[in-house]
Amino acid sequence: MHVRAGALGVKSSELNIMSNEKIVEVFGSYRESVVRNRRDYYAREIGKLRFALADVSAETSFMPYVSKYVIETTVVLGAVLIGAAQFILQDATHAVATLAIFLAAGSRIAPAVLRVQQGSITIRGALGQATPTLDLIDMLGDTPMIENVDDTVDVVHDGFVSEIQVESATLTYPNKPTPAITDISLCIPPGTSVAFVGSSGAGKTTIIDVLLGVLNPDEGSVLISGLPPLLAVAKWPGAVSYVPQDVVIAAGTIRENVALGYPPEAATDELVNSALKVAHLDRFVAGLPYGVDTQVGERGAKISGGQRQRLGIARAMFTRPHLLVLDEATSSLDGETEASISEAIHALRGSTTVVMIAHRLSTVRNADIVVYLSEGKVMATGTFEEVRSAVPDFDRQAKLMGL
C-alpha cells in the first residue's frame, strides 16, 4: 500500500506538469488553433489528463480509509478466533474473560495504529509528489547564494569597451550529427553595426546565443570587452541589451515593463521616457490617461503587437547600453515604424555597437559589416555591396526585395 501511495504521488506530479504544459501550449498558439480548428483536440487532450489526475486524486484520498477497514476487520476476526480457541481449549468463563481483554485492548490500540498507518500513507504519497522538487533542490544545492545585488541603473558603464572578439567558435547541439556553427572568427570593433544574414538554419540565432553567453562554444572563445560574455554582463550590468523576436510582456504597467528586472524606485521618468522615445512609443504613451503607469494587461493584451515589440526595444534601451543585440526585433513592425526605429538605431552608431539578425535586407543595408552565414559557416564578410558581389544567393535575395 505504501509503494502504491508513492507511485500515485509521482503520477500526480507528472499529470499536473503535462496538463499545465498543454494549457500553456494552447494559449500560446490560440490563433493557430482557431484557424486550424484544433481547439477540440486540445480540449480532449487536456480533459484526458485532468480526468486521469482526478482518478489519481480520488484513489490517493481513499487509500488512508482502507487502513481503517483493514484494522477494524482484523480486530473482529482476531476476537472471533481467540474466542473460538478459548471455548474449545478451556471453559466459557476463560473465553469470555480473554475476549473482553482482547476487545478492550484492541479498541484502545486500533485508533493509534490507524492514525500511524494513515499518516505514513499520506507521507509516502506526498514524497512521491515532492520527488521532482527534491531532485531540483539537489541539482541546485551547490549553487552559490546571490548576495548584495546592485539594483541601481548604471547608464555610464565606465570602463566597458563594446568590442566583440570571436575566435574559432564551434558548437554542436546534443544529439545532432553536424555543428550548428563551425570555426567562426570575428572581430567587431566598438561603435559599429553588424548584421548577420543567411537562410533559415544558417546558424544566425546560434551565433547570437554564443555572443550573449547563453550557449558556450565547444571549441574556441568569445570575449566582450576582454571578458567572457557572462563575466562582462556581471561586471557592467546594463551595458549589454537584447531584443528578441518575441518580446515577453509582463502583466503590469508600461513603466514596469520598460524597467523589467529593476525595483520600482529605479524606473525614473527620465530613464523610462528616454527609452520610450528611442522606441517611438513616447507619443502613444503621452496620449494615454495614466501615461507610463497604464496597465498593459496579461501578455500585453491591451496593446497591439507592434507596440509590444516597441516596448521590448524600449526595455533594451532603458539602461542606455553600449552593446545592443537585435534578433529580428523589427520584423513585426509596419514599414514606416520599422524605418523610424532603424533610423534611431542607426543614429547610435559610433557610441553603441549594434549586432542584428534580419531577414528584411532593407534593415541591414546600412550596416557597417554584413556577415553572410551558410550551414554554420561564414561565407563572406564586408559591406552590403561587397557581400552582395561575393555571394550570388545574397545578390538574388536583394534583387527580389528590390534592392
Model region roles, listed by residue range:
Residues 15, 31, 35-38, 62, ...:
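Cytosolic ends of transmembrane helices, especially the final helix of ABC transmembrane type-1 domains
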Residues 220-228, 235-238:
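Conserved ABC transporter NBD signature motif
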Residues 197-199:
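The feature captures the beta-strand-to-loop junction immediately N-terminal to the Walker
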Residues 137-192, 228-233, 274, 343, ...:
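Primarily ABC-family ATPase nucleotide-binding module
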Residues 1-2, 59-101:
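A hydrophobic transmembrane-helix motif
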Residues 241, 246, 257, 275-279, ...:
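ABC-family ATPase nucleotide-binding domain "signature/switch" substructure
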Residues 212:
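Helix-to-loop junction immediately C-terminal to a conserved catalytic motif
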Residues 247-295, 322, 393-396, 402:
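Conserved "ABC signature" C-loop
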